Amino acid sequence: RGLTRQVSAALSQWGIIPDDSAGMPLHLSPPGRLLRQALGILGKGVSTPTLLALLKHPLAHSGGARNEHLLLTRDLELYLRAKAIPFPQSAGLQAWAQKQNNPMALSWAGWVSDICAAHWPADSAPFADLLSQHLTYAEAICRGSRPDEDDEAGGLWQQKAGRQARETVKALRAAAASAAAVLPFDYAGVFNGVLAQNEVRDRDAPHPKILIWGTLEARVQGSDLLILAGLNEGVWPQVPPPDPWLNRRLRHEAGLLLPERRIGLSAHDFQQAIAAGQVWLTRSVRNDEAQTIPARWVNRLTNLLNGLPENGGAQAFSAMRARGDAYLKRVESFESWQPAPAALRPAPAPPKAVRPQKLSVTEIKTLIRDPYAIYAKHVLGLAPLEPIEPVPDSRLRGVIYHALMEQFIKAWPDCAPVDRRRRFVEISEALLCAQVPWPSHQAFWRSRLRAMADWVIAEEERRQTRGQPLVLEGRGAVLLPELQFTLSAIVDRIDMSQGAELYLYDYKTGAVPTPDQQKVFDKQLYLLAAIAQQGGFETLQPGEVVEAAFIGLGAAKKYQAAPFDKEPLAQAWEKFKHLIASYQSEETGFQARRALFRVEDYSPYDQLSRCGEWSLSAPARHEVLK
């Protein structure tokens, strides 16, 4: 059956559906797939990938307003990707629907919420009840939020496959009356097994001249061209199944047939088939694991012909191979391609009017290391899609740690010294429960946070002696009037001493930039300090920043101050203005991967820049755009 599916998939390139004598397995038909998807959600709950796969099924919401359903599904997918929501909930879906400019959005979101909320009973239940709940749920999915009149199940039970599925379900429902109570897990196994045992054949849809036969059908039917496929040992003939109870001698004494009888029947089928008018003998040279071995009768035929040179056997065999090679070359021509010239390293130079006039502090590092990413994001307006299945990655860990430090610092004045660790643990636990719905990562991050609690408290006591927190997660911006450029930022924390001196901190859960990196590439602390000194942050008057530092919250707990002694803040600010002025000039191109930290570092726009077709040592192609 695997070879049949491969051949059918290849023929689908030309819109050809072969007439398969075995039909399509019912569980692989559209109704079968939807019933199994519904079964999976009832048993395991809904996640973003499973929900989107269900909503995009061709039978989902087939009862009416299918076009609006597909439009809303697309918008919902973009929302779930952007917000990195692993498990959609009713409240979030309703909040999203209220922001949509679509009169159908609210009712549609309610329908999706019902899909997400469905689940099996906790304990065992009568088989008939589980079957009724399953079918009612599947019909509601197909009916949709705005069904047509007298439409109870959309297209679920329509077409040949739908009618066959309905007959199978009727037979199962009749047998369910005498079944005992079962667990939902056992019901799922029975239902999937029943679907897999049934097949669907549509005599009208397939091509009338392309047929896929089994050995039984090939014995009694003829064709103009017969292709004998899968001629490898273990496929044709198949390996006899092992008998765990009787060996060959005992089987013979009991009067049972030996396993080798099946090989004899396969040889008989091959002998009949190869006598057709025109025959192709085909086999795969490799499978998933290693080289394959030709079937024994192919080897026998090869040896026989090559062993009869005086009778023209070798010439006949060579002619057979030549005719086969001619067809193989045709197949290879379908897949041939003309090599395209390798792209040059791009460095587009767009007009000044479309160049970015506002960047955030964190984007300045990208502008220095990979200017092409800034061009793609701000000039072309391209943003990479988030993965369809959110994962608890370093970005989420950073969000958790930043929120923890913000809430903990706010609660610091009201906590007695003996209660600080307890308060730290309470805040971390609330954040993990609310934003990390993966139990394994919850446990792992919980252990790391509790292990660092004493260090955080001790370091915080030291920092509180120098100044009091004045700004937490504060937004700010500063305008460069001579360049008409705005630099925006979000600062994690700014403290003020009694002498009105400012201490600026930024939390890092990953690697902390070294002083040399801060001088050249990572200018975050310098730029935050410059904005603070100019009074660019809300609720903060201009003041002198005497120290700006990264606080490492990762495995290596590190405190790294900006090297103001090696490069004064005023000097760094002048360099920044020169950088912005350079990229506002139409002579400067946004070069791809200009100075990434490591060669293997990934940029979300590598595919757009055709990275891999050019080397990092290659000169950039400066292209002035109009």
What is the meaning of each model-derived region?
Residues R1-C415, E429-Q435, P439-Q442, D601-R610:
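Polyanion-engaging groove/track-forming segments
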Residues P206-L211, S266, Q468-G476, F485-V491, ...:
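Short beta-strand or tight-loop elements
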Residues E310-A314, S318-R321, L328, A532-K626:
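Metal-dependent nuclease catalytic regions and adjoining charged, substrate-binding loops involved
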Residues I400-R475, L479-P481, A562-P563:
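A non-catalytic, helix-rich entry segment at domain boundaries
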Residues V471-G536:
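Non-catalytic protein-protein interaction segments used by genome-maintenance enzymes to assemble
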